[in-house]
Swiss-Prot record:
It comes from Lacticaseibacillus casei (strain BL23). PROSITE patterns: UVRD_HELICASE_ATP_BIND (PS51198), UVRD_HELICASE_CTER (PS51217). It catalyses: Couples ATP hydrolysis with the unwinding of duplex DNA by translocating in the 3'-5' direction; ATP + H2O = ADP + phosphate + H(+). Gene3D superfamilies: 3.90.320.10, P-loop containing nucleotide triphosphate hydrolases. Heterodimer of AddA and AddB/RexB. This is ATP-dependent helicase/nuclease subunit A.
Length: 1234
């Protein structure tokens, strides 16, 4: 039975009021939620159909329903005899009712409301759900195009033209379109979209400017002033320690005006501006007389703090107050009508979009949610009571999972169906894992309740906060590392929440073993400390997807090296929590987490080159498959055949099949014209060569097909056109015969399904369909289903942090920690927030663009939101790890790779300050995860080897174990590029003649072009071989069958142990024995027992290894040679080589010129100044040495030839070591090797 903690038990049992459960990562929140439901049913006879249980995904809904039903069945089975008859019937009834319970997503619950009460808002119930983002976008695009034309032709044209000019570029008006779509999306997340849009222009009213400043701008400015004051106060305290008061006086002069402002109650814009523009930071005094080294360090530290304050002053405050109040008034008088026009157009667009959806009988999920809220606010025609009351009366409790991801609209829906006095809501989530801002989730809703609800309130009706801090997922160091970072970077100012003792993770997984591996930070760095050039004007995030390939490759190589170490190192182990023992690490235990998928291709390439299996969970490659690219190119040509790139793609594809030579021949017909015109010219000319004639015929056939397809496209639907293409070209059948054929055919079928869905949405026409597909590609939409992780697939997993939420992995690598945050949405002509809009106003006469204060406020708000969400993403990434955690990045300056010492120096400067939490300007100025992690680590005792920073008092005694490993330009072994095979234009042939012709190389069909020595060994009867293939065809002396004694491990021993297993174990012992130490019976037993303990060799097999035979071997001349030169001994050496086929297969003696690729593994060789000594172990029982030498001569010859190819030294000796008899034969000395 599960043992719950005190806080978990409280979350399970406390009710009669609203309960907010703040459940940290790995704290078992879903288990608690399910247990709460079970306990209510078991102990309170609650009815599950009177509970509303909402989650955020359909998968989570199905999982919860299953868990509840399973738990109830288990309770009925285990407690059947102790339950009364009534209790058993109740429990059985609840099990049956689970499928009917209201366990659903919020979208599904909203849909149910609409489908039940559609008539009270006059909604047509026959609507179709508009779930495809691209289809929704196209619908918006069509409505916007119509509205735009109407506006250009109306009396509002001048105002609309100015609107377009202000928010669009010089080339087109897509900027205004994008802004309009985003406005509608932002408004859709509110409870009243119309009110949101109507209120956009209010903050721009000149007469309300001071109110706008006081409510929206001054709070931000005050926060920045407090940051500056904090830095200056710290600098002042340092300067006061110096013998000369000049620096203290300078800092006090800087502090005085700030303190005056901060003490002023509700200062006006002019008051603040006058102080800011009138104050100048005096030049820092360079006096050094009378200062010892410690004083100089103190002085420099004070200067650094003052410089940081000055930078914030100049870079963040000054732009906000660049204009005088009179100038702002003038600009607002110009800007307010512009914003009013924008709001007016947005309202018209929203109305037109609603009308179009009604005409098409479609509703998206935002429409459904708003309609559900409208319905809940209406009265029931039958009872006259508010419909919301009907729902409140039907639910005893409303339970919400993942509450941190709620939007204001969803919160309003939940509030409408919940009881308020006392509350009946149970909300569980973790605001530190709120990472769906792009879906307009509002974590402030959770934070407000977190800050206002009480821990253990005395009033039984008061809302309660319960914190689940115990983490049952991760080892101590993973949790300590996470706490170490977040206790220094997250607070209400930057991060929205204080990461205090209540928020910190606590170790709860007491079943882990003793080992808690240290967290590792792996950094790819530059070798020298040369000055790096970087574009200071480049905004953070501008080059987010353009990280230099060599930097990304370097980081990937670091990861690959560490993965190979983990896999190969027997001491690198994981604790198996089920078996309660340590085990080796497998590839499937390892997961790579990335912020984005932009480097996935590069990572896949590097892993493939290294031979490390990789499973990519975030696959979006439907439109990148060859068959889809060919089909899309053909559709474009059918729509417009004068498109060069699609036309050439189709001509080169299997649909037409022209070679590169044929394409060049066409181009020669007309060199300086579009390719379609060159094709036309070629077809009009008389073919003069067989190749030209064949090309002419192929083009003629294709253009006849193309004409037919164009007719079909005009007269029929898309599905008919696509089926005709598949049938007439045979393309569907063709791809079925290629590798992965069934999947390729499924992809082509999916294209037809997509076309059918597209036309069902009311869209028509090939051109629009092509545009639809193009939009899907641009918006990163895909038809391919997300790949599912196969637990039996032994491969490293690669996925985004978003995809990993809710999952856990034994080993986690957080990749690209140096990658810039994406701040691009803070640089446009307009920035949207939940409060409204900030715009840049473009003077139509001077074309000068002004950043209005409202824009500055919106920009700051958006930046804070972005940083807070990035911080939460980092938290999610770190807390996915169960036992081993790696943070991987590069030492960067801007977008340039820099040296480690520069990066460490930057971290040390950022870590200044006595407070545990890093300075606000350091955290708000971060552009990557490393900008937070580095300063947080550099001030820790374990980082003393990197920088001589002062260990902060708050970190003294911190037991977090981590290492920072810096690799300077790791050597990347380039992958060999296969030689390109030239295209063969070929000629037309008579296929019937082909079928009648006798194949001249019939013998070769009974062999393979790729042979392992294990297959060829049959010619030599190697007893190490288990799989014997085509033995009668191998070249070499074939002893009479009567002389063939079965080798030792092809027969079974009396003990029942396979001789093959004994032979393999013997070889393994010889491979791993330490030749640098004396070989004794005790050392061999110790090695055997070690391999047995690690389960490399089975215990019953180990007992049958003949250790005496091994001792006897090392007493021979060859054995003593190995012991004398251990550094020059090479064991288990793989090789591959090409041999003429007639040297391997007797049947091919008459077919010279053919080659066979041979691969195998040599037992070992010794290389010294004179040459190479080759040796190979055998375990035959046959005492006839002459027969054995004859049997293995060919095999040793192959090995010797391979060694000669691998290295330049001659092979002087070829030893066969017969372990059973203790005989060592040199084939060269005996003459048997010839």
């Amino acid at each position: 039975m599960t043992q719950f903690t005190t806080s978990q038990q409280a979350a399970i049992t406390h009710d009669g009021h609203d309960v907010l459960v703040s459940a940290s990562a790995g704290s078992g929140k879903t288990t608690v939620l399910v247990e709460r439901i079970i306990q209510k049913i078991l102990k309170q006879h609650a009815d599950i159909t009177r509970m509303l249980i909402v989650t955020f995904t359909r998968a989570a809904t199905a999982e919860m329903r299953t868990k509840i039903q399973t738990a109830l069945k288990k309770a009925l089975t285990e407690r059947r005899h102790e339950l009364s008859g009534e209790d058993r019937r109740h429990l059985a009834n609840q099990i049956a009712m689970v499928n009917a319970a209201k366990i659903s997503t919020l979208d599904a619950f909203s849909l149910q409301i609409v489908q039940t009460y559609y008539y009270v808002i006059d909604l047509d119930p026959g609507f179709r759900l508009l779930t495809d983002e691209t289809e929704r976008y196209m619908l918006q695009e069509r409505v916007w195009d119509d509205l735009r034309e109407q506006l250009y032709a109306s009396d509002e044209a001048p105002a609309f033209e100015q609107l377009t000019a202000n928010f669009s570029g010089d080339r087109d008006d897509s900027g205004l379109q994008d802004l309009m779509f985003e406005l509608i999306r932002q408004a859709g997340a509110t409870t009243d979209p119309k009110a949101y849009l109507e209120g956009l222009a209010t903050p721009y009213a000149p007469e309300k400017w001071e109110a706008t400043f006081s409510q929206q701008i001054w709070p931000r400015v005050k926060g920045q002033l407090l940051q500056i004051a904090t830095s200056l106060t710290q600098a002042s305290a340092l300067a006061n320690q110096l013998p000369n008061p000049i620096w203290y006086q300078q800092i006090q002069a800087d502090l005085a005006p700030l303190q005056t402002l901060l003490e002023t109650n509700a200062p006006t814009y002019d008051t603040v501006r006058s102080v800011l523009i009138s104050h100048e930071f005096a030049a820092w005094s360079r006096i050094s007389k009378g200062l010892d080294d410690a004083d100089k360090d103190t002085k420099n530290a004070a200067k650094d703090l003052r410089d940081a304050a000055k930078k914030t002053w100049q870079n963040k405050l000054a732009p906000t107050f660049a204009l005088a109040a009179e100038q702002i008034g003038d600009l607002l008088r110009e800007a307010q009508p512009l914003v009013a026009t924008l709001a007016n157009v947005a309202l018209k667009f929203e109305d037109a979009l609603t009308a179009e959806k009604a005409a098409r009988h479609v509703q998206d999920y935002s429409d459904i949610a708003h309609n559900a809220l409208r319905i809940l606010q209406q009265k029931d025609p039958q009872t006259g009571a508010p419909i919301a009351d009907n729902y409140r009366a039907s639910f005893d409790e409303v339970m919400v999972d993942e509450y941190q991801d709620i939007s204001p609209l969803q919160e309003a829906l939940l509030a409408a169906v919940s009881t308020t006095t006392p509350g009946d809501r149970f909300m569980v989530g973790d605001v530190k894992q709120s990472i769906y801002g792009f879906r307009l989730a509002d974590p402030q809703l959770f934070i407000h309740k977190y800050q206002t609800f009480q821990d253990a309130p005395t009033d039984p009706a008061a809302p309660e906060r319960i914190i689940l801090a115990e983490n049952f997922r991760s080892t101590k160091n993973v949790l300590a590392f996470t706490n170490l970072i977040f206790s220094q970077i997250m607070d209400p100012e930057v991060g929205d929440l204080s990461y205090d003792n209540a928020a910190a993770l606590r170790y709860g997984a007491l079943d882990y073993g003793d080992a808690h591996p240290a967290v590792k930070v792996l950094l790819y760095s530059k070798a020298t400390s040369d000055e790096d050039s970087s574009d200071a004007s480049e905004l953070p995030g501008d080059a987010d997807d353009n990280e230099p390939v060599d930097i990304a490759t370097g980081q990937t190589q670091l990861v690959l090296a560490e993965i190979q170490r983990l896999i190969n190192d027997p001491d690198a182990q994981l604790w198996d929590r089920q078996a309660q023992e340590y085990r080796r690490i497998h590839y499937r235990d390892i997961t790579l987490l990335t912020r984005q998928t932009s480097q996935n291709s590069l990572i896949q390439t590097q892993f493939a080159a290294a031979g490390v299996p990789l499973f990519v969970a975030d696959t979006k490659n439907f439109f990148k498959t060859t068959e889809l690219m060919v089909m899309l190119a053909l559709l474009k040509v059918i729509d417009n055949q004068k498109q060069d790139i699609p036309l050439v793609a189709v001509l080169r594809s299997p649909i037409v099949g022209l070679s590169a030579d044929q394409l060049a021949l066409i181009r020669l017909a007309a060199k300086q014209v579009p390719y379609y015109d060159a094709v036309t010219a070629f077809l009009q000319a008389e073919p003069k060569t067989p190749l030209a004639q064949r090309t002419h015929d192929m083009l003629t056939h294709f253009f006849n097909q193309l004409s037919h397809f164009r007719d079909l496209a005009r007269e029929n639907d898309l599905v008919t056109l696509l089926w005709a293409i598949y049938q007439d070209t045979g393309f569907l059948d063709y791809v079925g015969g290629t590798p992965g054929g069934s999947q390729r055919q499924a992809n082509l079928q999916a294209l037809i399904d997509r076309a059918r869905t597209y036309e069902a949405g009311g869209f028509k026409g090939l051109f629009a369909f092509i545009h639809f597909i193009t939009l899907m590609q641009k918006q990163d939409q895909d038809l391919a289903m997300p790949a599912q992780v196969d637990p039996d697939n032994d491969a490293v997993k690669l996925m985004t942090i978003h995809k990993s939420k809710g999952l856990e992995f034994p080993v986690v690598f957080l990749m690209q920690a140096n990658k810039h945050f994406n701040m691009r949405d803070q640089t446009g002509t307009a920035i949207l927030t939940k409060q409204g809009i900030g715009i840049k106003w473009l003077d139509p006469e001077t074309r000068v663009e002004y950043e209005l204060p409202q824009y500055q406020a919106a920009k700051a708000a958006r930046q804070n939101q972005t940083l807070a969400e990035e911080m939460r993403l980092l938290y999610v990434a770190l807390t996915r790890a169960q036992q081993r955690l790696y943070v991987v990045g590069a030492t960067m300056s801007g977008n340039q790779l820099t040296s480690a010492d520069k990066t460490v120096e930057k971290w040390a400067a950022a870590a200044e300050g006595e407070a545990r939490v890093l300075a606000p300007q350091v955290r708000s100025g971060a552009t990557s995860y490393l900008d937070w992690i580095g300063p947080a680590l550099i001030r820790h005792p374990q980082a003393r080897g990197l920088a001589e920073t002062t260990i902060k008092p708050a970190l003294v005694g911190d037991e977090t174990e981590f290492t920072i490993e810096i690799d300077v330009n790791p050597q990347v072994t380039p992958t060999a590029t296969p030689e390109k095979v030239s295209d063969d234009s070929g000629t037309m042939v008579d296929l019937s003649a082909w079928f009648k012709k006798a194949y001249p190389f019939q013998a070769a069909t009974t062999t393979t072009g790729f042979q392992s020595v294990s297959e060829i060994k049959r010619a030599f009867d190697d007893p190490d071989t288990i799989d014997l293939v085509n033995a009668d065809r191998f070249l070499g002396p074939k002893p009479p069958m009567r002389d063939l004694t079965a080798p030792a491990f092809l027969t079974e021993t009396p003990s029942g142990i396979s001789p093959a297993a004994i032979g393999t174990a013997t070889h393994l012992l010889l491979q791993l024995v330490d030749l640098a130490k004396p070989i004794t019976m005790a050392s061999l037993r110790a090695l055997r027992d070690q391999l047995t303990t690690k389960q490399v060799i089975a215990v019953d097999v180990a007992k049958h290894i003949d250790l005496t035979a091994l001792i006897r071997f090392f007493e021979t001349d060859l054995g003593r040679l190995l012991l004398a030169k251990p550094q020059q001994v090479h064991r288990e050496v793989p090789f591959s080589m090409l041999l003429p086929a007639d040297q391997v297969f007797e049947a091919l003696a008459d077919d010279p010129g053919e080659d066979v690729l041979i691969h195998g593994i040599i037992d070992g060789y010794v290389s010294d100044e004179q040459g190479v000594t080759l040796f190979d172990y055998k375990t035959d029982h046959n005492p006839n040495t002459a027969v054995l030498v004859d049997r293995y001569r060919g095999q040793l010859n192959l090995y010797a030839q391979a060694l000669q190819d691998l290295q330049p030294k001659p092979v002087l000796h070829r030893y066969l070591v017969f372990l059973r008899t203790g005989t060592v034969v040199d084939l060269v000395a005996s003459g048997a090797g010839k």
